[in-house]
A protein has these predicted regions:
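N-terminal intrinsically disordered, low-complexity, charge/repeat-rich segments that act as generic
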Residues: 1-70
């Protein structure tokens, strides 16, 4: 049970980290190229997604760490 949960969380972490390091930077760059960032909905949406993914990765890593500490 514990190992399956860790494996599931680590799979999610891997997917989110891929999005964070490969997909989101491209999205943010494309949105930047559209011009004025103050009124650029695509840019703000990509940055919001980036913050969400960073928070989710952090939470999942914390959970994995907590599971490892359980007996």
């Amino acid at each position: 049970m514990k190992d399956a949960l860790i494996k599931r969380f680590e799979k999610q972490i891997g997917g989110l980290e891929h999005e964070l390091t490969h997909e989101l930077p491209k999205e943010i760059q494309r949105a930047r190229e559209l011009g004025d960032l103050r009124e650029n909905a695509e840019y703000h949406a990509a940055k919001e997604r980036q913050r969400f993914v960073e928070a989710r990765v952090s939470m999942l890593k914390k959970r994995v760490s907590e599971i490892h500490l359980m007996n």
